[in-house]
């Protein structure tokens, strides 16, 4: 025995140990095969088709026996064995067997997503549909059910919309109501007024003295709406310069109050107040003067159609506050014959007869005349045949002067005078 070589002893499992009972190496000898570093050359092509093992014999399946309708697969011998014995049930799910299909290796795709499913399909598309339908959706449903058990669904509380408090329609509470609500409330409030209230004389048309007239503390739109909600009278208060584009400057209050307090009340559209040193600035073309009527005011683009909707009342100017309180006669639907005609026969200036004409603002008025009536031009405005003399008033025509009862509580109404032929 050569030196350095240890004696070895083999047991029943063909494992050898040293004499000193010290484990040297474990080796399992197979007859006809020798272990070693030997290079093996593989001849052929690699097959990528998966290999499945039968659940009964634990051998790789070469030919599949696919059971219908449960779609479980075994080796063909085991599947036929259970069929021949007479069990007629699937050995995996104990489902009744209708028939057994025979398929070769590589033509069957088995589900391995969930442990224990092992259903087989003949195409990859069918397998993916099965996984999506049976496994992915089931997981989502189970997850949602578990979340509902852990955290049950609580319905959100019903939010109750608080009712808008009913504000008083005075000057102190107008800032709580938007302009849209004023427009909606003005129509029923004016329609519910009796006809007797329209013809009552208005005592609030008098211009206050200069020392008692306060400056307007509220914006223009609030002042306009506050007159809509009044019970007596169909007045509309509008700011003269409510548009920033108008170039006319508002004069100081002391210059105009003595002038207009002493002027008489206009009772006919053919009459024009005597002009003295100062004149009222004409309304800007972009924002014409709104005239009183029992309906909401019209748009800016139609100034000539407004005058046919209100009874005949007076016109008073309050220039310290920047307002015009106007009451339009009811017979402005058709031009009265007292209005002089122009050279071309048009009578458009009769619609503007109740305005104060100011020659100082003629340039500004004619520059923006596109927004007004096209017949109102500079030549027509300066024509002495159209406008009366600046000093003195011509005697009013007896046929067209309205009776005093119409101006102060008469029995004539706006709807009666509107359709009378002239």
UniProtKB/Swiss-Prot annotation:
Domain annotation text? The HYB domain forms a phosphotyrosine-binding pocket upon dimerization, and mediates as well the recognition of its flanking acidic amino acids.
Give me the reactions it catalyses: S-ubiquitinyl-[E2 ubiquitin-conjugating enzyme]-L-cysteine + [acceptor protein]-L-lysine = [E2 ubiquitin-conjugating enzyme]-L-cysteine + N(6)-ubiquitinyl-[acceptor protein]-L-lysine
Annotated region (Disordered) at 190-213, 378-422
For whether the record's keyword set contains Flavoprotein, the answer is no
Stated role = E3 ubiquitin ligase catalyzing the covalent attachment of ubiquitin moieties onto substrate proteins. May operate on tyrosine-phosphorylated SRC substrates.
- Give residue ranges of zinc fingers (C2H2-type): 109-135
Location(s), subcellular: Cytoplasm
Domain of life of the organism encoding this protein: Eukaryota
| Assembly behavior | Homodimer.
Which Pfam family is an annotated match for this chain, by its short name?
A: zf_Hakai
Which segments does the record annotate as RING-type zinc fingers?
54-94
- What are the Pro residues biased-composition ranges? 393-405
Extent of the signal sequence: none
How is this protein named in the record? E3 ubiquitin-protein ligase CBLL2
Per the record, the pathway is:
Protein modification; protein ubiquitination
Biological process according to GO: protein ubiquitination; regulation of cell adhesion
The record's listing under InterPro entries reads: HAKAI-like_RING-HC, HAKAI/CBLL2, Znf_C2H2_type, Znf_Hakai, Znf_RING, Znf_RING/FYVE/PHD, Znf_RING_CS
User: Locations of Basic residues compositional bias?
Assistant: 410-422
Organism of derivation: Macaca fascicularis
